[in-house]
């Protein structure tokens, strides 16, 4: 070789040496890349490869969503969701609900509803159909809505003059079921009549619309459309600027007063406020006009007294006429959803499919008020075929046990603090998947008239009885697309009736995918209960403050709830994988079981192109604080998903 090199010209010799160096660099880079890829996707031995229909469908979903060009240690959300967001308008979350609603609609439409003698399921089906008929244009009840508003003393868009605020508030709640600002439950006992005031059942719809209009700046069009449909003649009307300014101001006053329900106590300022025309004699007169017999004294209590007090402040600071106009504006917005197809589209202001999905949710929740289980009874009978219920319950117990172990080992653990009432029972968790008689309503509900084709008339029936607060909270959670509801009084959580839906859960999927989807919801619910129970402990507040990452306190709370139980989720999956080796999914063999847990966890949070709000890497915010994630993907110290400083968790 030395002889050969001596015979080569110097320039050529340098060129060969340079080429050798370049080749060495290329080979080294390739080896490093392969090593990194191997670290990301280190295979674990699987007992078998799942090729069931559920597995193949899920594999197709993930493979079309995962963007392999993205380093999961740099941006895990984009790694998992890049493909989905490019190809879909709706989020995975919304897409799942759309699928659930399609199945529910077919089920409810197949139920035979007799004109009389209806049972709970038949009445719920009739309410749902009458609601959907408005959206589909087969019924128009604008005339009935306007008549009902007239009966309540609401003349919007005309400004209110010398209006009876108390009568309108009580009438829309007790006769129409269109309570927005305030709802009232009448409790009669030996001492007289007790009115329990609470946040209106339709308040959420006004708040959500206000938030969307603030983001889209389409308020003037929305206002004008309502004004033209509800205007009675050519008399003067309120302006868009007047209503926008008052609504913005009022919601700022009341929004910080919507705390969790407390034990009911008296609100004397509502019963006796002469400057607002409120006296016990006035309450008696209005109640008697609304067919409520008042033999003795009247009292007003509330489980949300701060909210009620804030409503009174808005009333007092602006006078009865202005406040009545605001009450009217809120009521008209809610009543429009009962009127006709055009007004429904004006409210949602989006494409037909999205409107159909969200109004379908509205209709389902209206039916749930009459029977929280009936709309989902047949749906869940299909979902829970085979061993699905047993698998879901065992998963829930496994995650609860792992969470309790972590909690017990926490430095600040306090045996006197109850996070979960009974760790070994899931009766409350799966309450909505069991048949129950009575469902906790009042006796009046057993004597309800039969439902008809009129949605307006059907919804008036809701004012004849009062459901427990947790039922109303469940309805609100369904409309918010939540998978569970926290029952603080019972120190537990309750799954929504659709929580065991694909792709969140399917008993035919490997444990990794079910723990990443359904299991993460169980962990999140337990995280919420933990933070609530330890809210007076500074260390739990430090978790929330750390998870804010410069955002709002509410954002920090949400991120902390989602994150605090993820270590327990990993423990739960590991315990299952050790007992019986997990299966992999055909087409996803390169991912380990734990990697699939994190992928499935993130996938259900993938946003679509139409998603509102900041495009933050929602999965990264939580998973960067979970050391098991960095270990599973071999993330180098200092990578975005393996930071030097993590938030303190359990």
Predicted regions and their residues:
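Helix-loop boundary elements of multi-pass alpha-helical membrane proteins
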Residues: 1-26
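Membrane-embedded alpha-helices of multi-pass membrane proteins, especially ion channels
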Residues: 27-38, 528
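Ser/Thr/Pro/Gly-rich low-complexity linker/stalk segments immediately outside membranes or between
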Residues: 35-54
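Active-site-surrounding "flap" and adjacent substrate/cofactor-binding loops of secreted or lumenal enzymes
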Residues: 53-55, 71-74, 79-142
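Hydrophobic/aromatic-rich, well-ordered segments within soluble, folded domains that form packed cores
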Residues: 65-86, 213-230, 566
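Intrinsically disordered, low-complexity linker/terminal regions across diverse proteins
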Residues: 97, 101, 240-243, 252, ...
């Amino acid at each position: 070789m030395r002889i050969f090199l001596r015979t080569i010209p110097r320039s050529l010799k340098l060129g060969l040496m340079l080429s050798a160096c370049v080749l060495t660099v290329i080979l080294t880079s390739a080896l490093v890349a392969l090593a990194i890829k191997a670290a990301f996707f280190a295979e674990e031995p699987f007992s078998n490869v799942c090729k069931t229909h559920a597995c193949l469908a899920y594999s197709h979903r993930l493979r079309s969503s995962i963007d392999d060009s993205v380093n999961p240690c740099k941006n895990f959300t984009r790694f998992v969701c890049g493909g989905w967001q490019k190809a879909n308008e709706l989020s995975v979350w919304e897409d799942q609900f759309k699928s659930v609603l399609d199945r529910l609609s077919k089920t409810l439409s197949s139920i035979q509803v007799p004109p009389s003698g209806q049972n709970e399921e038949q009445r719920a089906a009739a309410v749902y159909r009458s609601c959907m008929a408005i959206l589909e244009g087969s019924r128009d009840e604008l005339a009935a809505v306007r008549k009902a508003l007239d009966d309540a003393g609401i003349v919007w868009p005309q400004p209110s003059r010398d209006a009876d605020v108390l009568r309108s508030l009580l009438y829309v709640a007790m006769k129409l079921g269109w309570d927005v600002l305030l709802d009232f439950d009448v409790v009669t006992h030996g001492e007289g009549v007790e009115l329990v005031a609470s946040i209106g059942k339709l308040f959420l719809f006004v708040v959500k619309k206000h938030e969307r209009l603030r983001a889209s700046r389409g308020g003037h069009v929305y206002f004008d459309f309502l004004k033209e449909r509800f205007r009675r003649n050519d008399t003067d009307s309120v302006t868009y600027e007047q209503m926008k300014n008052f609504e913005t101001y009022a919601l700022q006053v009341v929004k910080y007063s919507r705390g969790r329900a407390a034990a009911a106590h008296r609100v004397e300022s509502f019963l006796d406020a002469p400057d607002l025309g409120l006296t016990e004699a006035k309450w008696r007169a209005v109640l008697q006009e609304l067919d409520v017999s008042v033999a003795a004294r009247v009292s007003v209590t509330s489980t949300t007294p701060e909210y009620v007090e804030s409503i009174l402040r808005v009333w007092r600071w602006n006078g009865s006429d202005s406040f009545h106009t605001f009450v009217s504006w809120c009521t008209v917005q809610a009543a429009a959803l009962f009127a006709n197809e055009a007004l429904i589209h004006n409210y949602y202001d989006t494409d037909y499919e999205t409107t159909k999905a969200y109004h379908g949710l509205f209709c389902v929740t209206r039916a749930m008020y009459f029977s929280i289980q009936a709309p989902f009874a047949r749906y869940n009978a299909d979902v829970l075929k085979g061993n699905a219920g047993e698998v879901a319950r065992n998963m829930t117990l496994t995650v609860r046990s792992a969470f309790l172990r972590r909690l017990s080992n926490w430095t600040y653990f306090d045996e006197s603090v109850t996070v979960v009432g009974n760790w070994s029972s899931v009766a409350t968790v799966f309450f909505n998947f069991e048949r129950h008689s009575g469902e906790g309503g009042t006796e009046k509900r057993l004597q309800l008239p039969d439902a008809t084709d009129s949605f307006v008339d059907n919804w008036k029936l809701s004012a004849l009885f009062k459901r427990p607060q947790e039922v109303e909270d469940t309805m609100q959670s369904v409309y918010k697309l939540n998978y569970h509801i926290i029952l603080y009084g019972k120190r537990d959580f309750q799954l929504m009736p659709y929580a065991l839906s694909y792709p969140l859960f399917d008993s035919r999927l490997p444990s990794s995918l079910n723990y990443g989807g359904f299991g993460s919801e169980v962990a999140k619910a337990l995280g919420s209960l933990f933070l609530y129970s330890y809210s007076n402990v500074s260390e739990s507040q430090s978790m929330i403050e750390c998870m804010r990452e410069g955002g709002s306190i509410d954002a920090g709370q949400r991120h902390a709830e989602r994150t605090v139980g993820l270590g327990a989720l990993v423990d739960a999956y590991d315990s299952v994988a050790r007992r019986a080796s997990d299966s992999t999914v055909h087409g996803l063999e390169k991912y380990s079981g734990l990697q699939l847990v994190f992928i499935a966890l993130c996938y259900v949070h993938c946003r679509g192109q139409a998603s509102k709000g900041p495009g933050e890497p929602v999965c990264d915010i939580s998973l960067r604080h979970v050391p098991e994630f960095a270990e599973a993907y071999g993330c180098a110290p200092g990578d975005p998903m393996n930071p030097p400083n993590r938030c303190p968790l359990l």
